Structure formats: C-alpha cells, structure tokens
C-alpha cells in the first residue's frame, strides 16, 4: 500500500481513505486543484495496481498540521510500503517521520523539486 497526501476539491480533511479504483478516487475527491500533484500520483499508484491510501490536505506543502495529523493517523497501518507528500520538503516534518519510516521499512517518495528543496535547506 502507498499512502499519498494531496489537495482535492472534496473529501474530509484529517481522514485516511483506502481507495481501490479510479472511479472511487474521483467520486471521493473530485478533480485536483491547479498545480496540485497528490491526486496525479494517486492515479499512477492505482494504474500500477498498488493499494492506495489517500489523505486530503488543505494545501500541498504548506498545511503542516494536516501532514502531522495524517502521519499520526497512518502510523499504526503497517501495510504501508511508501508515503508520498508532494510539495512537502519541510525539515521538521521529514525529521519527525524518518525514525518511523526506518522502523517500519517504508519509503518516503519525493519529487525532484522537493528533494532539492530539502537538501538545499540543510545548508
């Protein structure tokens, strides 16, 4: 299972949604807002026949509280193989999640831009 965080036009905040089809994804979250990539990656996950858990955030990369609530909500779900947070390169959030990722042997999925932002912020 891959957990993605992202913006959407509908759906409750602070709730992890297990999604099994494209129809269910669109029915639950609607269309992605302009410049949002979370739903795009969620679609790719389903097209690659992977299980999906989607967590709606108010604004990708900026709704720190939404990310923290979401990370705590999915902390007990041990079937998650990877977590994707497009737009999120905040050092505090990444450092908080890293021990859990290592413990559960999960991957953190970055976009190239987010990885660059994270690495250059470390200097």
Across the structure, where does each feature detected by a protein language model lie?
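Surface-exposed assembly/interface segments
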Residues: 1-123
